[in-house]
A protein has these predicted regions:
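Residues at secondary-structure transition points
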Residues: 15, 51, 65-73, 95, ...
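Conserved alpha-helix/loop element of class I SAM-dependent methyltransferases that forms part
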Residues: 18-22, 26, 50, 55-58, ...
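Conserved nucleotide-cofactor-binding alpha/beta core module
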Residues: 83-202
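Substrate-binding/catalytic lobe of Class I Rossmann-like enzymes that use SAM or dcSAM, i.e.
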Residues: 191-221
Length: 221
């Protein structure tokens, strides 16, 4: 992948990305570091070329295998809520296209990302490699189990909704750490922030949302 591919042109140009950043500001995204990344990380390389003309719309798009790339507002909101610091270790449950992965990896020291659909893993790795992001480990696995051998984590982000928060993810959250996750069924979900302190866990409910379900187990495709 060439530098020109990363920079984009026309509907993937920097001007188009800047317009997206402006819309994110209008919708309440205030973290300047997150906004800068939303304007600089090339979303168009994380989707099929047939959809590249829509890469900087605030909409979700298909990435194959019944999965989608999240809309930019959701990516920015989740990243802002996680409040990642440069020296922290983060777990992402659901690599998908790798777009949210790239944003998080640009914010933290080490990122560990799990994807249940095996066919998506090499695609994400190729795209992340093109961006020369070297602080990421991606593997095929069950997100419900987390990645205990690399925990505890300062931040855990789950861009899919389990009916209840998996116990393993709570156990892998470090003291001082934060978990951001939508919780609920297809009919009703709430976006939650879980913080672990020396005294235990605190839960903050933010708003009603609608995410794809977090599916247990693994799959080839």
């Amino acid at each position: 992948m060439s530098q020109c591919d990363l920079q984009g042109s026309g509907m993937t140009s920097q001007r188009t990305r800047d317009r997206l950043v402006g819309r994110l500001r209008e919708h309440g995204i205030e973290d300047e570091v997150v906004l800068q990344l939303m304007g600089s990380v090339p979303r168009h390389i994380f989707i099929d070329e047939a959809w590249s003309h829509r890469a900087y719309e605030d909409s979700y798009l298909p990435i194959g295998h019944g999965q989608t790339i999240s809309q930019p507002l959701i990516v920015a909101l989740m990243s802002q809520l996680l409040n990642v610091q440069p020296r922290e270790r983060v777990l992402e449950v659901g690599t998908g296209s790798g777009y949210q992965t790239a944003i998080l990896a640009s914010l933290c020291q080490r990122l560990f990302s799990i994807e249940r659909i095996e066919a998506l893993v090499p695609r994400a790795q190729e795209r992340l490699g093109a961006m020369k992001l070297r602080n990421i480990r991606v593997r095929h696995g069950d997100g419900y189990a987390g990645w205990p051998e690399h925990g505890p984590f300062d931040g855990i982000l789950v861009p899919a909704a389990p009916p209840e928060i998996p116990t393993a993810l709570i156990e892998q959250l470090a003291v001082g750490g934060r978990l951001v996750v939508p919780v609920g069924t297809d009919q009703a979900q709430l976006l939650k922030v879980i913080d672990r302190t020396d005294d235990g866990l605190t839960e903050t409910i933010l708003e009603a949302v609608h995410f794809v379900p977090l599916v247990n187990g693994t799959a080839k495709q």
